[in-house]
């Protein structure tokens, strides 16, 4: 019987599927190995235990979010780009809840792979905000504000805190409109 070959990328894709399907509590070396059809010991050639898997998944998920956002705003500018960014951010969080949660692992220091992945997300926000007139530190401050507002909405939505009869889509449109109208143009 031939041994099944695995690599870090396939492991992280399986780990992402596990957390997107059942949350962080479902993530284990055994669960990922089972999904890949290998013995758990095979994973240790690529990761440093469960802590390494969690950290590598955070980098993978943060990179995925950055790519998702960049794809949404390419060839857009101004408030159109701001709206596309907000919609894509919410969509990623809704379609990939486990990966979105994994992006919240704080980067330990600048220059490491997780810090660099977080910087890529900030760069997308800063580029979009440059198209509406923000530069330098001001762009970073406004990026934090916009991201915080969107993160707050999607976090409340994820825990089921928006249960009234008032339509969530309309609320999100209000949020986007408020953010867009508050920005320089």
Regions found by a protein language model. Give the residues of each.
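Helix-turn-helix
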Residues: 10, 14, 18-52, 56
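Alpha-helical DNA-contacting segments of helix-turn-helix folds
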Residues: 19, 53-61, 103, 107, ...
């Amino acid at each position: 019987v031939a041994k099944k070959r695995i690599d870090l990328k396939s492991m992280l894709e399986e780990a992402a599927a596990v957390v997107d399907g059942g949350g962080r509590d479902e993530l284990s070396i055994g669960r990922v190995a089972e999904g890949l059809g290998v013995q758990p010991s095979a994973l240790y050639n690529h990761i440093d235990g469960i802590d390494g898997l969690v950290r590598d998944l955070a980098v993978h998920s943060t990179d995925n979010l950055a790519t998702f956002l960049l794809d949404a705003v390419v060839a857009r500018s101004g408030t159109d780009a701001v709206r596309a960014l907000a919609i894509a951010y919410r969509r990623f969080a809704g379609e990939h809840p486990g990966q979105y949660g994994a992006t919240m692992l704080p980067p330990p220091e600048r220059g490491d792979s997780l810090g660099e992945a977080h910087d890529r997300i900030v760069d997308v926000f800063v580029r979009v905000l440059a198209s509406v007139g923000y530069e330098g530190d001001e762009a970073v401050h406004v990026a934090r504000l916009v991201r915080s507002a969107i993160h707050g909405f999607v976090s409340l939505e994820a825990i089921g805190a928006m249960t009234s009869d008032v339509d969530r889509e309309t609320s999100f449109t209000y949020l986007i409109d408020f953010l867009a109208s508050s920005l320089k143009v």
